[in-house]
């Protein structure tokens, strides 16, 4: 199930992902939980979240390589401001015995600003938000409020990010 931050967003082996465009670098990122309407420690969300990410760029596109997939986004005309979105539907429980299953839509939104408009990006700052909502026709009442789940749907949480390039020469 790809809802928990620590599970489905495993940033373990970032080097293994393919890197389109020009390499900006590998970044050590610290995320601080800014707000959550999902509940305390919902989905494994902690107050501090440390991970690594590789960033590349090609023209006005930015690529966020987390070790499991490559997410693409856009860089604004200033060459520094970026945004990346992705959506995934996750089946929590299958339908059965006269009852619909529980399917949750998770939307990830990353927004930020690179320290440089070229290829020498030493750092970036931004936010990473996760939004969760039950898909129409789903019944998630057994899951909502259970251990490690969310307190209510829809809900969201947001981390403020501070990323520093790990090696000064990319």
Regions found by a protein language model. Name each.
Residues 128-170:
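Edge beta-strand at a domain terminus
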